[in-house]
Amino acid sequence: MADIDARLREDVHLLGELLGNTIREQRGAEFLDKIERIRKGAKAGRRGSAEGAEQLSASVDGLGDDELLPVARAFNQFLNLANIAEQYQLMHRRDDTQPLPFESRVLPELLDRLKTEGHTPDALARQLSKLEIELVLTAHPTEVARRTLIQKYDAIAAQLAALDHRDLNSTERAQITSRLQRLIAEAWHTEEIRRIRPTPVDEAKWGFAVIEHSLWHAIPNYLRKADHALHAATGLNLPLEAAPIRFASWMGGDRDGNPNVTAIVTREVLLLARWMAADLYLRDVDNLAAELSMQQASDALRARVGDSAEPYRAELKRLRERLRATRNWANASLSETLPAPEAVLRDNRELLDPLLLCFQSLHECGMGVIADGPLLDCLRRAVTFGLFLVRLDVRQDSSRHCAAMTEITDYLGLGRYEEWDEQTRIDFLLRELNNRRPLLPGYFKPAADTAEVLATCRVVAAAPTASLGSYVISMAGSASDVLAVQLLLKEAGLQRPMRVVPLFETLADLDNAGPVIEKLLGLPGYRSRLHGPQEVMIGYSDSAKDAGTTAAAWAQYRAQEKLVEICREQQVELLLFHGRGGTVGRGGGPAHAAILSQPPGSVAGRFRTTEQGEMIRFKFGLPDIAEQNLNLYLAAVLEATLLPPPPPQPSWRTMMDQMAADGVGAYRAVVRENPEFVEYFRQATPEQELGRLPLGSRPAKRREGGVESLRAIPWIFAWTQTRLMLPAWLGWEAALSKALERGEGTVLAQMREQWPFFRTRIDMLEMVLAKADSDIARLYDERLVSAELQHLGAHLRDLLSQACNVVLGLTGQKQLLAHSPETLEFISLRNTYLDPLHLLQAELLSRSRSREASLDSPLELALLVSVAGIAAGLRNTG
């Protein structure tokens, strides 16, 4: 551990020194001295020096308006460079004396354990190859880093790897350092922040870039290692057409609260995905054609290509022509609707079969070593990504469907749908679903909102089946919400099954999820249309905002248990879709632990979850890191399927019921019932300013109003910027303290020891409390909050202190995260660069609120840079 610390600090020191050189060259030595004084003041302040803290504060206060932006940029760049060093450290810095990282050994060790538990080799191979894990990439307003910069950061990581060789001579070391200096200078002189809000298409292109630069390479690598682990444990191989992990996307499909995502945008994103897939396969096939110059071929391949002297190249040439035709058609279709020529690839078999033919021929002719190289990689990609790269989900709020149905029934003279009771709605919807005639006449001219809903349904109906995932209904609360979407899709001409997925996201809706699904599955007209599993989405963000994470986590657990029970009774398979955020307050945290903490039976070989924008870069932005995270998902879902945790004991349930009640009471007493809270929130955090900044294509609010009108992301994000982290812990301090006051400490210890659900909750709570910082939060209050509201901030900081103390008591530690010195080291390293950014942000907010400033003024740009830097520094709580 000490060796890792020393090496990490060595890398950070080097990168910081090179950044300093760049800053000195542009701004002069005097300006660099200011930066260094601020950094040293922050470092001394962290060590408890009052003089250091005063020096830091005075240095920031003394900055002129023209210095605010470059100072903010300097510390933002420091944090991004520290992230690069940390990611590299976690991935590569291990010599032969150190054990393999957990992510690399988790699957082999699990397979050995499963064999010991009595699972046969055949059963293990069968289960691993039929796993269905889908990671759904979503846009996220806190992912503000530009793709241009991300590529430069990746190049810096590559140079750190090049430097990490003991046999380098001084000339080689100097050359690598020079390349690092150039890359850091390029990053410094590149504007890191978008000045205009990205469009949904921009966000989708960002997602495609992650696939192109990282996942495209990681997929065959992780599958090769999974195949090796399976063979070592069982003697069996992973089938060629196994794709345990696939990808879907919400970028360009999620229109909930985002008027910028229209039917036209969704069609464009579907075509862009098709173009991108064809382009990536073309690159692969070009490389394969260059490599596969062999003459010997199987009879099956000869039957296809005749007596060609280069049979593999001949077969690949045909595929290349079809891929080119597909790419050209998709590109042309972006500007006008065109029929697809015959050469365009329509079915994944048309892509797979030529590759399989070449693969099998090489094996038959004794050239397996060639087949198992890049050709196998291309095959694995073709199975995983298909012709459409990702499956696009569509998401819309239930109220939009209700409004559309109301306009339709009103027009038809049937009354107002929104005023009908639930049973009347169900009867009407089932009747129309079974009716062969259209519901609407061709001359119906709906209002703009209804027209957009219907246009979206028409895009869905026209799109190829394999290009789409699920139609998700946010704020679902009844069976009719699902049936209404089915009817709207039928009316648009959809003639194939499509998963229509209710998303239950408030506390009340989570409690009602079981009864709603039970009602749906009890309708013969619905069951006859259900092909495959019943998919249900569990919302983590809004339930936590509604009730606090204590009550929300328990409601999510109980809802899943109930859904498992109902689907088992109804003999229907269940697919749970987890709408987790990157932050703890939105259900985030390490995926491996989260999956293993799900209720028994809820992960039965299937798992679907969102991956949020800011976490996509950290978990999947580099091929090696993506590979590790794919390994973790694969192992966790396999373990949760074959070794599910036992159900909680009755006494634990009783305890959680009481803690949830105490937690929601304490949370709502602050957030909902204190009349001063909303005003304090708006003064103490950058919430108002975040709404003005170009952070993502979606508006920050659903509508005007208080906390309930905020989307979950800015709600969490605002508290994270000030380090109070309130949404992630508020309620737990009361729930745990009251349990201890009742003398139930032994039961709590037992729950933490024996129940993965509770242990994971406490671990996540401890992690977020370690990143929270009362002193930083107080600093914002002192500069931004009016005197009459200061007492509320002090009260919240007292509650934070209470939460820290009760968690320390529960874990038996003297310091949060004492059991994880590596994580503590990473937090400590970042604080030196975060502290000045927090102080700077508070000063920027103070200056911004006292004067009018245009969105492109240095003041506003510096504020945006500070937001991005703090998000980068805090990562999974950013």
From Swiss-Prot:
GO CC aspect terms: cytosol
Swiss-Prot/TrEMBL catalytic activity: oxaloacetate + phosphate = phosphoenolpyruvate + hydrogencarbonate
One Pfam family named in its UniProt record: PEPcase
Required cofactor(s): Mg(2+)
GO biological process terms held by the UniProt record: carbon fixation; oxaloacetate metabolic process; tricarboxylic acid cycle
GO molecular function, one term: phosphoenolpyruvate carboxylase activity
InterPro entries recorded: PEP_COase, PEP_COase_bac/pln-type, PEP_COase_Lys_AS, PEPCASE_His_AS, Pyrv/PenolPyrv_kinase-like_dom
Its EC number(s): 4.1.1.31
Keyword NAD set for record: no
UniProtKB keywords: Carbon dioxide fixation, Lyase, Magnesium
Function (record text): Forms oxaloacetate, a four-carbon dicarboxylic acid source for the tricarboxylic acid cycle.
Entry's family note: Belongs to the PEPCase type 1 family.
Protein name: Phosphoenolpyruvate carboxylase
Gene name per UniProt: ppc
